Amino acid sequence: MIKFALALTLCLAGASLSLAQHNPQWWGNRNTIVHLFEWKWSDIAEECETFLAPRGFAGVQVSPVNENIISAGRPWWERYQPISYKLTTRSGNEEEFADMVRRCNDVGIRIYVDVLLNHMSGDFDGVAVGTAGTEAEPSKKSFPGVPYSAQDFHPSCEITDWNDRFQVQQCELVGLKDLNQHSDYVRSKLIEFLDHLIELGVAGFRVDAAKHMAAEDLEYIYGSLSNLNIEHGFPHNARPFIFQEVIDHGHETVSREEYNGLGAVTEFRFSEEIGRAFRGNNALKWLQSWGTDWGFLSSEQALTFVDNHDNQRDMGSVLNYKSPRQYKMATAFHLAYPYGISRVMSSFAFDDHDTPPPQDAQENIISPEFDEDGACVNGWICEHRWRQIYAMVGFKNAVRDTELSAWWDNGDNQISFCRGNKGFLAVNNNQYDLSQELNTCLPAGEYCDVISGSLIDGACTGKSVHVNEHGYGYIHIGSDDFDGVLALHVNAKV
């Protein structure tokens, strides 16, 4: 009986920990993460204070923070080839990182670090030098900056069969030296690295290539981490938020269900299906059942996105900034529909898969510059600064904890719905106008469309909609309008 009670206690403790790892630790009603891909720490700190906090963003996913190999031309993916756990990259050093985390936490913006637990750098001719000056010999699996040696890695092999669990989890993903997370020593180094970031005030981690590591090894590592640092405003006993990169199209040998009990999982099917719909390859009317009916994970387990730094570079159904009208419609739907833990992308311009972030002649990452409207102009795309996107972050905050209701569609690609009595969204992806009296579910009054403009000094700078005492308003979205979406909420009432 004593053994049974102890086993039950340990089981419940494990379940409690994994449940806690689904909590993003947001402030107030904020509930959207932005990925400031390849930004410098000093620029993120300023962005938290001057833009993200005033507009209600909840958190920032940052690029990998630990030392990486220096590759010719400085492609973005060099950040995913670590050679030590020293906190020095082209984004800045440890002091600058710590300053950024503190300043962002001070204004209610949580920081989530993209972490590389699966591997170290791939092969390199001779001695490689990292961004902190550390030398390594990746071809010999020698990384003295940790230190790691060959005994800390799985034997080298190539993934040739993605239906072979052994290959997926113990061979080398695109040639990257595959760490043995079952080793006590490797586990200790990974835990030490993550705990240091927790000490500096981060709220959690995006775990890169999670499906290439055994779930039981990750469970041990996550369960061994420290609680979040209360000196950065986290409650006592708060656990780091975990979201794991698991690409699962529904027929994978290693499935997302092996990981969703440990933390949230990146829902790639969401990205693919929302792209198909807003590219016109699937009628928007079918989105009424969006979510688990589409085979997605449950809402609290799914990290959702229109695109990410990887799949925005691939051909196919996924939308990116290069299709701005459809991209903004898809993002508006993403942030308005009550499903998932939402993340929006903030990119830099690219012409090919390997394009580096904006950099100067000395290959230093440059800071974003802004025009008079606040949009980025020097190679940074900054989708999060597009009015149509940051306005929907405010919409999502305004309607938090409300249900979807009053769905309407025209049987094709015009849809609308309410979020309780706090918000209304309409979308027109047809080649003809949407002109219709629709139920907005809002209290009577005049409302600004936050897509086409803003509420400033008691007046709308874009479209406005009069809502009658029954909650109905006349909605017009022309087929040739700049944006194919209209959004109203209670905080944009004149």
Curated annotation (Swiss-Prot):
Primary localization: secreted
* Amino-acid positions noted as binding chloride in the UniProt annotation, renumbered to this chain: 206, 308, 343
UniProt-annotated binding residues for Ca(2+): 118, 169, 178, 212
- Reactions mediated catalytically: Endohydrolysis of (1->4)-alpha-D-glucosidic linkages in polysaccharides containing three or more (1->4)-alpha-linked D-glucose units
State the SMART domains in the record.
Aamy, Aamy_C
Q: Cofactor note from UniProt?
A: Binds 1 Ca(2+) ion per subunit. Binds 1 Cl(-) ion per subunit.
UniProt keywords (A-Z) are:
Calcium, Carbohydrate metabolism, Chloride, Disulfide bond, Glycosidase, Hydrolase, Metal-binding, Pyrrolidone carboxylic acid, Secreted, Signal
Q: Where is this site: Transition state stabilizer?
A: 310
Active site, UniProt feature: 208 (nucleophile), 245 (proton donor)
- Signal sequence segment: 1-20
* Class in the EC hierarchy, top level: hydrolase
Q: Which GO terms describe its molecular function?
A: alpha-amylase activity; metal ion binding
Q: What EC number(s) is this enzyme filed under?
A: 3.2.1.1
**Which positions carry Pyrrolidone carboxylic acid?**
21
Q: Which InterPro entries match?
A: A-amylase/branching_C, A-amylase_C, Alpha_amylase, Glyco_hydro_13_cat_dom, Glyco_hydro_b, Glycoside_hydrolase_SF
Q: Name one GO biological process term.
A: carbohydrate metabolic process
Q: Which PANTHER family match?
A: ALPHA-AMYLASE
Subunit organization: Monomer.
Q: Which family does it belong to?
A: Belongs to the glycosyl hydrolase 13 family.
Would you tell me the protein name for this molecule? Alpha-amylase-related protein
Please tell me the species this chain comes from. Answer: Drosophila lini
